[in-house]
């Protein structure tokens, strides 16, 4: 499945840009930014119309695609293919499980848990998609929906992309780029216009997905600063300033690279996030949290199939578009970024280890997070009677977490730490995204010049600022759902491609095993077999056969070793 074209060239000192990918991607981004900033009001109105159209027309496709992704990765993991390594059979993981999970956690969730951990359960409780609001059933439904939105489904999206990339790159020597996932379908055409187009869509999806994250981040940072220092206003100007300042921090991290910058920030994120969760668990309604965690998990698992295919087809509500489709679309648009990033850090793990690690561990952590923060908020409303929290969250989603912390001990200190955590998540998302986009725009090259990484980190900030000016969260929602559509199609094709590749590898393994078992040199006994074994041992190939093997196999393998050693420094 490999070819001489597939090995990424060693990056030169000035540029590793792949022009047919870089230029179209930058052109689309520049046109979008110019069009948005030249007339923000008109752009905002257009985004709203597009969002309505996409929701009504393609909602069914998004839901079906995500269901297929989930079934596919689970089926592959628990099949006989689950023992296949993402790399040579002798490869070992490069990172410890803790460091690996920390980077998974920071890249895959980032600001989402902090932004929606309190806000989403409260909003669903006060305005559920089904049934009356402000009831016990509404509270149960709110937590079930939150679990569904951030559970197995979104990690299946990341898992499919990451698994496909890691398999084709590390197992078969193809570039660590989205185009490689289509090799079993289109073959060598991945090196031409079709492959370039796939990577362009991957860049655009990643760019708008990260821009959405940055937009949500600065909104929550602004709310936190206003909460701590009321003289700081909540407006777009402050949020743009925050984007500029924190993009500068992200640039410093991205210059440091994966092992130094991203890994250290990811570990810091995980420590701060777990510390914050344990604090709220300890000082909040601990027993209530434990009870609701068990009940919510059971409710989620028992209703997962119905939720997966629910589109509210018999109602005229826009709830599904504003919530489920937005979150799934946001996740799909993030998939090239998160998938490529987790593929980079997962070399040497088996397919089963990869799928279980990517899907199960983060999902359990998510359920714990929403139970701690979401159920603490619901307890505050339903038991303690602080119903004003509903109005505060509805007025400004970004302030939800800080309003919850207001009713816990050490409010100012914990709120300040929360702002720091949001900033570090912001920086991690930006610098990880910059590394991934830069690799995609370079045809899969992993070691690129500093100026390219700086360029993409800066571009992410500009796009986020432009979308904020054009209508805030609504514009961000539209950009993510729109960019997710073509990439969802690419992901379905990639799943078919990987399935075909695994079937071929399985057939080769069976064939090799049968040959070894039937070989005259096998462990069989009987009259005359020793003569066959001896003849096999002294049956040396002719000189021309040896020279052909060296030319076609030996030189190519040594060239790959040379490239790998050069990239590793």
Where are these regions (language model features)?
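Terminal cytosolic tails of multi-pass membrane transporters
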Residues: 2-16, 78-88, 358, 370-407, ...
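Helix-loop-helix connectors at the membrane interface of multi-pass transporters/channels
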Residues: 2-13, 175-193, 217-241, 273-276, ...
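Membrane-water interface regions at transmembrane-helix termini and the short interhelical loops
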Residues: 7-14, 39-54, 73-94, 142-149, ...
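Hydrophobic alpha-helical segments of multi-pass membrane transport proteins
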Residues: 28, 61-77, 273-284, 365-375, ...
